[in-house]
UniProtKB/Swiss-Prot annotation:
The gene is engB. It comes from Geobacillus sp. (strain WCH70). It comes from the Bacteria. This is Probable GTP-binding protein EngB. One of its GO terms (cellular component) is cytosol. Residues 22-193 form the EngB-type G domain. Necessary for normal cell division and for the maintenance of normal septation. The lineage of its organism: Bacteria, Bacillati, Bacillota, Bacilli, Bacillales.
């Protein structure tokens, strides 16, 4: 896909702040600091539309990025970040659940995991949650540039087996550094547009 226009449209914490209209949305989920913002920036050929941070837990709102005036990427707060209070975690959970279970514009969730490590318990819980609600999911195994090419298949197998990925969901090897998997990711997303 050729992205000619991309802008942050809305930062929201509750449904009444979500953008109006019926444009399709793709939510980006994953643990804190896994590379959701880097994924957005690579996909749209921008250096820093989505702010990246080395500090986990930076994204605290649902950030809606309007792409080509035809759909949104929705960056959701990362999970599994230890240094937030129980109260904040509960508020986060409620915000996420509300969005994922009630938003009609949501077409699919892009679940981003780190190829270097087996998916965490939080990754597994997130994937099971998405499957429970029958939300189509595209799994992006990112940071492929940090794993030797000869070990990619072995690492992908661990991701596939740990998450117990169903046949309909696509698993894509990705690198925000090299652009590996970008075309495949666009092809997977375009199926839902």
């Amino acid at each position: 896909m050729n992205v000619t226009k991309a802008e942050i449209a809305v930062s929201a914490v509750k449904p009444e702040q979500y953008p109006d209209g019926a444009l399709p949305e793709f939510a980006l989920a994953g643990r804190s600091n896994v590379g959701k913002s880097s994924f957005i920036n690579k996909m749209i050929n921008r250096k820093n539309l989505a702010r990246t941070s080395s500090k986990p837990g930076k994204t605290q709102t649902l950030n809606f990025y309007l792409i080509n005036e035809s759909f949104y990427f929705v960056d959701v707060p990362g999970y599994g970040f230890a240094r937030v209070s129980k109260k904040e975690r509960e508020a986060w959970g409620k915000m996420m659940e509300t969005y994922f279970t009630t938003r009609e514009q949501l077409r699919a969730v892009v679940l981003i995991v780190d190829l270097r490590h087996p998916p965490t318990k939080d990754d597994v819980m997130m994937y099971e949650f998405l499957k429970h609600y029958q939300i189509p999911t595209i799994i992006i195994a990112t940071k492929a540039d940090k794993v030797p090419k000869g070990k990619w298949q072995k690492h992908l197998k661990v991701v596939r087996e740990t998450l117990n990925i169903i046949e309909d969901d696509k698993l894509i090897l990705f690198s925000a550094e090299t652009g590996q998997g970008k075309e495949e990711a666009w092809a997977a997303l375009e199926r839902f547009l």
